[in-house]
Each structure stands twice: as structure tokens, then as C-alpha cells.
């Protein structure tokens, strides 16, 4: 997000505003101060806009013509909530998501207007980039709509890490003679070339089934369970079965609701292998180092 946010305006004759001294929790005040036309954000920034309560209902955000996020995935409920927030404040920008990483030289995809921004959709590969899906841990290329590891070939890829072992794991020469970047992210690509990013790494559960955080979050989001404002999964190693994992669900509830009120509907909408071991309530989504603090909850 940072690299794109700097390169895009510099390469297109736009005014670039850099503010390294803004406290993240005051991002709403800075937005109202500078009134940006284009803003490449992270989900944490939008969450602060929504929940800080300092942007009044009648505040006009029509100056914002382009808005989107990177850094981490947004589930369907987050996407709907953020799009509604923009619309309620007279902003007609389409809220979008992108995908990239430092190792790939920043952005790897570009949102496309004809396609809905849901279910982990991050758009199509940027020009000159080649993105393909491979069976995790192999060089076997998969077909459309098959979930596997997202890999990228292109001139923007890094030269390597300081650690040769990590470099060899990330940059692999395939049988086609190309050096592919293995991102470690799992997803799939549709026949139209639209990439969907679903989770980080493979997380098989004992008894069968691979746990994908965004896929499970979207199922709960699409169930539209009354009382749930926001939710996210945390996947942790299964101490009883090495190499296997367990899911836990964290929810932010509307006033007056308890976990007991929503638990049955959560279990009903999910496949059995996706059932959370437990459901915990939080007052709000926690962030650390600009991302949802899943590590701190493990």
C-alpha cells in the first residue's frame, strides 16, 4: 500500500501528501483536514473512521473519488460496512481491495469494475505480471477455481532476502525456466482472470478439511446473523495432532446480544470441519502493527 501510494501520484502528476506523524487513531481528523481525492488505505484506517464517532452523519465526503485497501483481507461484512459508510457520507467511490507484497514489488493486481468486490476478490494481474495458482509445496499448476498457492512471475519481484535459505524457498525456478515468487498465500483464479485470496498457508484440520480464514468469515458474513457487527477467525496449531490446526471465532456484537444468541446460527451455516472450537466476544476488532491482531489472540 505504501509503495503504491507513493509511486502512483508521482508518476501521474498528482499532489502527494505525506504525513508520517499522524497517530493512526486520529486518521479521521487528518482526512477531514486534507480532504484527499484518492486514498489507498489499510482496513485499520477505515475501521477507525467508522468507529471513532467524530465524523458526523451529515459530513460530506464527496471529495473522495477513489478509495481502497491493501495490507490484509476484508471479509464480506467489512466490505459492506465500509461501502455503506462511504455512501452514507455522500461518497460515490467504489470501495475496492488490492493484493501485493513487498517481495513482489508492491501491487500485483488491479480491481475491475464489472466484477463484484467480494469473496476475497482482488482483481486481475497488473500488466507484465503473470500470476498463477500452484499446488502448495509443488510446481504443479492448477486450473481455474482450484485453490492453491498464489505465485507470481514478473520484473518487479525481489532479488532475494539476506538469508539464502529463505530466498530459495520464496524464489523457485520452475520447469518453464521462469523464477516464480511463492507468496505463501492461498487462493484461486476464475476463468476471467480474477484472483481471490482466501488465507495464509495451508491449515489442515484433523479429520479432514483445509481451514481458510476468509472463506469461513465470508460464510458467517453472508449468513447475516442478527447481532453480529463484525467477526474474524484465528487459526492455531492443534497441540494434540501436530501439523493440524484448530479454528476459533471472535465476534463483535450489537448491544444487548451475547455469544449464546448467535452461536447456533454460526454452527448451522458452517461445514462441520469449519466449526470453531469456541466463540469469544470482543468489544472491537483489535489491531497491532496495522493488521488485525490475530497473533496476540493465539
List the model feature ranges, each with a label.
Residues 132-151, 188-192, 259:
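Conserved beta-loop-beta connector loops within the AMP-binding
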Residues 17-19, 96, 279-283:
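General small-molecule cofactor/ligand-binding pocket signal
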Residues 11-14, 36-40, 50-118, 130:
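Gly/Ser/Thr-rich phosphate-binding loop
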Residues 45-46, 74, 157:
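Alpha-helix capping/helix-boundary segments
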Residues 268-292:
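AMP-binding/adenylate-forming catalytic domain of the ANL superfamily
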Residues 1-38, 52:
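Conserved AMP-binding/adenylation subdomain of ANL enzymes
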Residues 120-125, 177-178:
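Short Gly/Pro-enriched turn/cap motifs at secondary-structure boundaries
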Residues 39, 154, 159, 169, ...:
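AMP-binding/adenylate-forming catalytic core of the ANL superfamily
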Amino acid at each position: 500500500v505504501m509503495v503504491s501510494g507513493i509511486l502512483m501520484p508521482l508518476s501521474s502528476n498528482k499532489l502527494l501528501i505525506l504525513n508520517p506523524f499522524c497517530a493512526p487513531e486520529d486518521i479521521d481528523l487528518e482526512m477531514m483536514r486534507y480532504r484527499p481525492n484518492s486514498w489507498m488505505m489499510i482496513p485499520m484506517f477505515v475501521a477507525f473512521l467508522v468507529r471513532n464517532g467524530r465524523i458526523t452523519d451529515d459530513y460530506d465526503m464527496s471529495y473522495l473519488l477513489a478509495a481502497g485497501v491493501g495490507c490484509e483481507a476484508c471479509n464480506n461484512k467489512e466490505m459492506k460496512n465500509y461501502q455503506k459508510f462511504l455512501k452514507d457520507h455522500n461518497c460515490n467511490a467504489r470501495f475496492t481491495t488490492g493484493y501485493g507484497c513487498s517481495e513482489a514489488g508492491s501491487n500485483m493486481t488491479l480491481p475491475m469494475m464489472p466484477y463484484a468486490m467480494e469473496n476475497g476478490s482482488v482483481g486481475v494481474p497488473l500488466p507484465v505480471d503473470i500470476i498463477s495458482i500452484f499446488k502448495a509445496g509443488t510446481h504443479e499448476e492448477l486450473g481455474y477455481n482450484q485453490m492453491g498457492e498464489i505465485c507470481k512471475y514478473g520484473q518487479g519481484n525481489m532479488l532475494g532476502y539476506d538469508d539464502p535459505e529463505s530466498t530459495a524457498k520464496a524464489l523457485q525456478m520452475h520447469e518453464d525456466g521462469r523464477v516464480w515468487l511463492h507468496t505463501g498465500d492461498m487462493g484461486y483464479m476464475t476463468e476471467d482472470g480474477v484472483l481471490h485470496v482466501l488465507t495464509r498457508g495451508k491449515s489442515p484440520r484433523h479429520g479432514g478439511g483445509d481451514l481458510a480464514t476468509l472463506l469461513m468469515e465470508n460464510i458467517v458474513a453472508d449468513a447475516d446473523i442478527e447481532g453480529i457487527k463484525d467477526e474474524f477467525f484465528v487459526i492455531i496449531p492443534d497441540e494434540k495432532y501436530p501439523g493440524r490446526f484448530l479454528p476459533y471465532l471472535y465476534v463483535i456484537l450489537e448491544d444487548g446480544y451475547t455469544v449464546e444468541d448467535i452461536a447456533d446460527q454460526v454452527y448451522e451455516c458452517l461445514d462441520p470441519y469449519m466449526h470453531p472450537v469456541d466463540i469469544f466476544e470482543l468489544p472491537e476488532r483489535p489491531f497491532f502493527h496495522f493488521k488485525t491482531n490475530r497473533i496476540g489472540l493465539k
